[in-house]
Amino acid sequence: MKRNLLGSLFALLMACSPAQQPADQTQPQADIEGWNKGAIATAANPHAVDAAIEILQKGGHAVDAAIAAHAVLGLVEPQSSGIGGGGFMLVYESESGNLVFHDGREVAPSGATVDMFMVDGEVLGFVDAWQSGKAIGVPGAIAMYKAAHDEHGHLPWPDVLEPAIRLATEGFEVSPRLANYLPMMAAQSRLDEAPGSAEYFYPGGNPLQAGDLLKNPEYANTLTRVANEGIEAFYRGEIAEAIAEAAQAEPNPGSLTAEDIAAYKPARRPVICGPFRDMSICTSSPPSSGGAQIMIAALYDHLLTGSDSQADKVAAFVDAQRLAYADRDEYFGDPDEVDIPLDDLLNPDYLRYRATERFEPGATPTPGDPGQVLRGDSSAALFGSDTTEEAAGTTHLSIIDGDGNAVSMTATVEAPFGTQRWAAGFLLNNEMTDFALEVSVDEERPANAVAPGRRPRSSMSPSIIFDSKGDLLMITGSPGGNSIPAYVAKTIVGVLDWGMSAQESVDHPNIIARGESVRVEVNVEPGQAIADDLKARGYNVQERNGENSGLHIIVVTEEGLDGAADKRREGIVRTIPPN
């Protein structure tokens, strides 16, 4: 058995109203004929951005371009996401002002049990759990694609999948980031042993090299069937049976069945919006962690001392994270299964009070009690604690089309290469390890406990920000597991308060404050100075030589569209000038 994967992976990864609203939010109607800023796409791989631009040049909607880009990402960046996983898509329709949140999160099989990752009273080792069949949830990406396309798409359904089909058939050059993973994964995981995965990533027993031409006819065939026959070709029949067979295989087989796969439905969830100064942060509701963006921004404002010192602002940002993460970890889960006090958590009166519960720098923050604060009716006794870790096998893309419609989309297979199990040309997710793993059947259960048909909590936080007039201002999002709320909040605060450009906010050192310690990315200026100042203030600082963000953001300025791709990955920005 190959062990110690998680630590090695981290080492490699371094190389509106604040209350919940009905399913849609509406911004003031935009002047479509007045949109003269062109179009833009940014994502984690040039092939994906090229696919998005190709679709936009054909008159496609931002949703069409997002589907095309992500279908390509599943091919060229399989370590991060794909059609064997799921995602969240936040859509802004400029003509109507509507915001729509499409939830393609994976769901637990009907045979899932609350203690399925417990063995003899102990939690199954994370690496074993991660690569097990138990970890596979029903993939939601394809169903989310179709739901979003049916509602927003302009081009025919087969057209949006054609770039990925063409690239899988003709082949593409293996990127350095993908190639760099493979020797380490061979040494410390089962990727080089898993049927299908081994033959694809290690032809002849040797890992693919950067620059190798790689074709995936299985993937092309799967997408061709979905394009021609509809998503039933994925969720019923041979492809679904292949997914179930892979999930039920040894070692540590799972219970996922073809019937579970056939039963999958995407969800259309509420969009939540909250104020930051005179602007509005709009984001995805649970099971995502988008609400943490609203919480961090509000808490940051309350914690500011009035000082112009950037060091004081960073300290306020750290404390805002610490409080928001504690509440997120306690209360967020699947809203279909758990009564999440989201309105209370985002209530301005609660957030104002919560900011007064500032913890000593060396202390571990505990969750607040919004029900007690607002009504004298405690929320704290509802759930057990949960400190679930999430690995960083995720991707994000941001797109604006020529009409000013926008998409912020984050997608994942959870850990790098998911479970490393292969079916029909793609890797299968390990999303079930996003649930609370350590659970007693006899004790109070976390909000994020496993249950049949339940969607695990996610840190993914696709967000769209509007200015004081309700005009589109910013699109942001990132991969990064539990660090996603911190990564995304950095760009929001960086652009809207620290005066940074899109690229400056992305390039700025990442600062993550979940729990007792504060991680600071010291290999990026001024990371070391930030770490030194926080240490002097008494914080328990972990200095990190790199973080695994993959921020792809767009800021709308008077001059045009300011896009940024995270240099920590392989992304680019491309624009189409206005007519």
Question: Residues of each region from the PLM?
Answer:
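Short, small/polar residue-rich loop motifs at catalytic or cofactor-binding pockets
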Residues: 268, 391-394, 458-460
